[in-house]
Amino acid sequence: MTQPIVVAALYKFVTLSDYVELREPLLQAMVDNGIKGTLLIADEGINGTVSGSREGIDGLMAWLKSDPRLIDIDHKESYCDEQPFYRTKVKLKKEIVTLGVEGVDPNKSVGTYVEPKDWNALITDPEVLLIDTRNDYEVSIGTFEGAIDPKTTSFREFPEYIKAHFDPAVHKKVAMFCTGGIRCEKASSYMLGEGFEEVYHLKGGILKYLEEVPEQESQWRGECFVFDNRVTVRHDLTEGDYDQCHACRTPISAEDRASEHYSPGVSCPHCWDSLSEKTRRSAIDRQKQIELAKARNQPHPIGRNYRLPSEA
């Protein structure tokens, strides 16, 4: 029986002043363990999602934890039948999740972590302002009951949204969440700096909540967007029902795929009337190469246009 592929989402805010020198040995550790996916490293820490065999993931995590700075690195696991990534990469970044505000440092200041088992009690408190820190395309397919959608298209827009809509003197309790915990952790650091005093965030993010909280007790509604070829996962962390448009990167449903405006790998109902001719031609060429590679049982020559959590 074929063993399922293990998908591990991991991150840690920690000062890595030698992150440039760390790139090559980290990449070699991924290759040695047969790992696919992308890891981002910066002075402020490490972030990414990777996949491989059980032994491979265990080997990579052991390698990471051999560094005393990463011994308690956070990671969440899920499983799938097909490899969700095509390449193995380590990227050097200014930030491991891009907020774009100087001075925000979760290594120095961060909100209160809330365990998944305690999350429901917090977010059902009428005095708590619940904010989804993810982007609009993620929120559209699933979120927590009663959560506010900032309708951002990039995490860089989050600070301006907060400044325009909320006041530390009025909004006394704020709870935030994101896919794996990293974005809301950085958002909590930002909000503390803006004067919000009681700031909470979901430890381990949505993925940890879905893993630990029974569906019958859950406050989660819908599916959860993930940054790999699975596109979404259900409450039981199995692969969801959405695909992703290669052109605009929007999650697309079965109804979207049935639309006359859907062309696999080229366009969907969300973007068919806004694509430039250059983008359309490029998408058509890319799709042809992908289909040829698939027919030959070869790796995809051009990776899907998926956003990384740090760049979204």
UniProtKB/Swiss-Prot annotation:
GO MF entries: oxidoreductase activity, acting on paired donors, with incorporation or reduction of molecular oxygen
One GO biological process term: tRNA modification
Catalytic residue list: C178
The entry's keywords: Oxidoreductase, tRNA processing
Xref: InterPro entries: Rhodanese-like_dom, Rhodanese-like_dom_sf, TrhO, TRHO_N
Region (Disordered): 293-312
Function in brief: Catalyzes oxygen-dependent 5-hydroxyuridine (ho5U) modification at position 34 in tRNAs.
Protein name, UniProt field: tRNA uridine(34) hydroxylase
Source organism of the structure: Pseudomonas savastanoi pv. phaseolicola (strain 1448A / Race 6)
Underlying gene: trhO
